[in-house]
């Protein structure tokens, strides 16, 4: 019995060794490598610098994105050109407006965005020619654009229900000829705050019927219902800013804001109320090219945008993106001429121009006031036909 068991064990061991050896040396077994799915990291790595680029010292140049490449040519401590220096704001009108803003618990983009033109817009002697830009829906934005100094938070406080009434009261006190209502982005609200804005416009028109109202609103995440609510609120100018050219948009604006979405918002506002003046603004000095600015103007004319403004990007703090170029006043004048030649109704262009700067300038005011009687005539004719 012992001999039989020993021989069986020897057979088992030898059989096992044979099986192992045949498995290892079988040349017919297919060995197809498993294909890995593409990832953003993998795509970026494949498009990045090669080993030869690292050896030759070209790696940094190859890996830079367009915005960083433009910035790499900027001097770190370049001096502010003389045409960008402004006097300290002063004057009785300036201080009166500031006091009323505090008393009525209102926010202004003039202060929040540290606008260099606050003294010019608020401090003029003729109040009917002054322009104030009231910021509605609070002073905290749900988005974080890399050029903007307004506070950000995912969940800002609830909108003040008295804000439409208080804003209308302030406008009627000041006796302004033109007011701009702007707003932080409120992605936390279902309608993006469109009904709150529209109610403010209606209140102003009730208390100050001769005041022209412009709203500088966000993109409402591309929600056309919200755009329609704003366009039909009784406002005079519908403004929404592209901010920059298409290639720089992902680097400059919040990821939820896209170039095409902004164009569609302006297009929808015009389609909803064809007599509405539509307006947008572009910052220069971010690294944009001549051809890109021309293409942006073409895109705007294609959707029948009426007004465009150009201004110099100014870095609010060291935490924000750097200035690539200080554009000269002569170049701003060139862009103004280009815009007017392309058929824009009006163009404000200059180093210190902002989207709301001198919004009530005589030319655009005259255009709006001339349109009023025509609109009233059309309404009377349509009512007569009914």
Swiss-Prot record:
Q: How is the cofactor bound?
A: Binds 2 [4Fe-4S] clusters per subunit. One cluster is coordinated with 3 cysteines and an exchangeable S-adenosyl-L-methionine.
MF terms per GO, please?
Answer: 4 iron, 4 sulfur cluster binding; lipoate synthase activity; metal ion binding
Task: State the superkingdom.
Answer: Eukaryota
The first-level EC class reads: transferase
Give residues annotated as binding [4Fe-4S] cluster 1.
110, 115, 121, 356
Say yes or no: keyword 4Fe-4S present: yes
Supply the alphabetized keyword list: 4Fe-4S, Iron, Iron-sulfur, Metal-binding, Mitochondrion, S-adenosyl-L-methionine, Transferase
Occurrences of domain Radical SAM core (ranges):
124-345
Any one of the GO CC terms: mitochondrion
**Where, in this chain's numbering, is [4Fe-4S] cluster 2 bound?**
141, 145, 148
Q: What is its EC number?
A: 2.8.1.8
- Family affiliation: Belongs to the radical SAM superfamily. Lipoyl synthase family.
Name of this protein: Lipoyl synthase, mitochondrial
């Amino acid at each position: 019995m012992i001999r039989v068991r020993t021989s069986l064990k020897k057979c088992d061991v030898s059989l096992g060794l044979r099986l192992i050896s045949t498995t290892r040396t079988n040349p017919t077994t297919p060995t197809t490598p498993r294909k890995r799915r593409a990832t953003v990291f993998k795509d970026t790595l494949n498009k990045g610098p090669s080993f030869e680029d690292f050896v030759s010292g070209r790696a940094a140049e190859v890996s830079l994105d367009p915005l960083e490449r433009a910035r790499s040519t900027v001097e770190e401590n370049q001096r502010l050109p003389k045409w960008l220096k402004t006097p300290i704001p002063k004057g009785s009108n300036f201080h009166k407006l500031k006091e009323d803003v505090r008393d009525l618990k209102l926010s202004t983009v003039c202060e929040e965005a540290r606008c260099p033109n606050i003294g010019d817009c608020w401090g003029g002697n003729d109040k009917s020619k002054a322009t104030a830009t009231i910021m509605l829906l609070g002073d905290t934005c749900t988005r974080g654009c890399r050029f903007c100094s307004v506070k950000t938070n995912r969940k800002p406080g609830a909108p003040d229900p008295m804000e439409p009434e208080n804003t209308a009261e302030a406008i009627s006190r000041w006796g302004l000829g033109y007011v701009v209502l702007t707003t932080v982005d409120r992605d936390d609200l279902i309608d993006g705050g469109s009904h709150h804005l529209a109610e403010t416009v209606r209140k102003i028109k009730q208390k100050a019927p001769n005041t022209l109202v412009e709203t500088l609103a966000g993109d409402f995440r591309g929600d056309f219902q919200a755009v329609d609510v704003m366009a039909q609120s009784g406002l005079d100018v519908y403004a929404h800013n592209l901010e920059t050219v298409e290639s720089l948009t992902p680097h400059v604006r919040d990821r939820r804001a896209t170039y095409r979405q902004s164009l569609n918002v302006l297009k929808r506002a015009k389609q909803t109320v064809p007599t509405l003046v539509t307006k947008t603004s572009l910052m220069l000095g971010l690294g944009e090219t001549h051809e890109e600015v021309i293409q942006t103007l073409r895109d705007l004319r294609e959707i029948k945008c009426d007004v465009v403004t150009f201004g110099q990007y100014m870095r609010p703090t060291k935490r924000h993106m750097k200035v690539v170029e200080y554009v000269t006043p002569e170049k701003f004048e060139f862009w103004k001429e280009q815009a007017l030649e392309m058929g824009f109704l009006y163009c404000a262009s200059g180093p210190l121009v902002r989207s709301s700067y001198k919004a009530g300038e005589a030319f655009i005011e005259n255009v709006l006031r001339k349109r009023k009687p025509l609109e009233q005539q059309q309404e009377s004719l349509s009512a007569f036909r009914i």
